[in-house]
């Protein structure tokens, strides 16, 4: 569904080019949950912005369904990729229904008027994340976990085959982090969504993810199943320059001792 070919991401400022990650060859398929792991500030958000079309690649190709990302119009992309942001300041003055309805913008035309089918999709999206009882509540009154579910419902209402989330469990308490990850896993399977998320919740994400994209210290990205990345030592070497190592017995990183 989504793949990259020798992708290099970073920034241009006039003639100055800053490379963040390079030669990336990874894929994302329908029905799977993939977690993007790596150290803070290593380029995970830059990669997500690039493969979602928000930021231009420095070189290489991002393809969706075998077609170059640059060949799609912005409207076409809005029907292919839904993006869930972590910013807690967004949409506080809207009700849950109004927020989720924004996901229908690619289909509602210039004036944004929803018809019966649009309202049906919105209702189904809210139900899918277990928020029907909060439909008319203002987003500002929701807990962080409820707000994240509402944002996921907005992406579902957009009816895209791909959903990308940048740190969806940031700011959440333990129970909400677990609920959010379990929800994303269930949506990937039941609705055959291709879901990609970045996260620091290693211990929580590993049991639920289908595959990993690991950003290494040498600015490359390695993909594979947990079993593959444990067997070849990639997970253990992820933070090789730090005093931590991967412990496969607890599926998390521990301080070396």
Question: Which residues make up each language-model segment?
Answer:
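ABC ATPase nucleotide-binding domains
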Residues: 239-257
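Helix-to-loop junction immediately C-terminal to a conserved catalytic motif
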Residues: 52
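Conserved ABC ATPase "signature" region
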Residues: 101, 116-134
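Conserved ABC ATPase signature
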Residues: 138-142
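Catalytic Walker B motif of ABC-type/P-loop ATPase nucleotide-binding domains
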Residues: 163-166
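The feature captures the beta-strand-to-loop junction immediately N-terminal to the Walker
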Residues: 37-39
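Conserved ABC transporter NBD signature motif
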Residues: 60-68, 77
